[in-house]
Amino acid sequence: MSSNSKRHSYKDPKYKNTNPVKIIPLGGIGEIGKNMTAFEYNNDIIIVDCGMSFPEENMPGVDCVIPDFTYIRRNHEKLKGIIITHGHEDHIGALPYFLREFKCPVFGGTMAIELIKLKLQDKNVPMEGLKLTTCKNGDIIRFGNAF
């Protein structure tokens, strides 16, 4: 955490004996693109979005910029799945790189899942062992013990 960062805490007295939910931005904060946020509670992590951004002019030879996966590498055993909000590049563009390294289920709407399939095929990501689940309005999905 940089010296300018602030740690925010909200304490509701009726939840005094519970552990906090950690919100870990992995990209997309203070920038356009690379949207990716991890939510951790006890021994479970879920991720919302896994996007990319386009390189700046001073980055010759770079095709895309992806979020920093370091926190997930250190805590991969807690990872329960990824929720994709929609199929724009800044929300799904880093999935081929992420899913090569981490095998976890991916959940999203019909259009998002179809775009993800095309993206994974385009980037030659092996589909075997990957679980891509289409969700519809009203679906309830459980992740681990916490979510």
Regions found by a protein language model. Give the residues of each.
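Metallo-beta-lactamase
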Residues: 1-24, 40-52, 111-147
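Beta-sheet entry/capping signal
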Residues: 18-20, 45, 103-106, 131, ...
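Catalytic core of the metallo-beta-lactamase
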Residues: 22-27, 32-41, 138-147
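Pre-active-site segment of Zn-dependent metallo-hydrolases
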Residues: 29-34, 41-84, 97, 101, ...
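N-terminal Rossmann-fold NAD(P) dinucleotide-binding loop
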Residues: 91
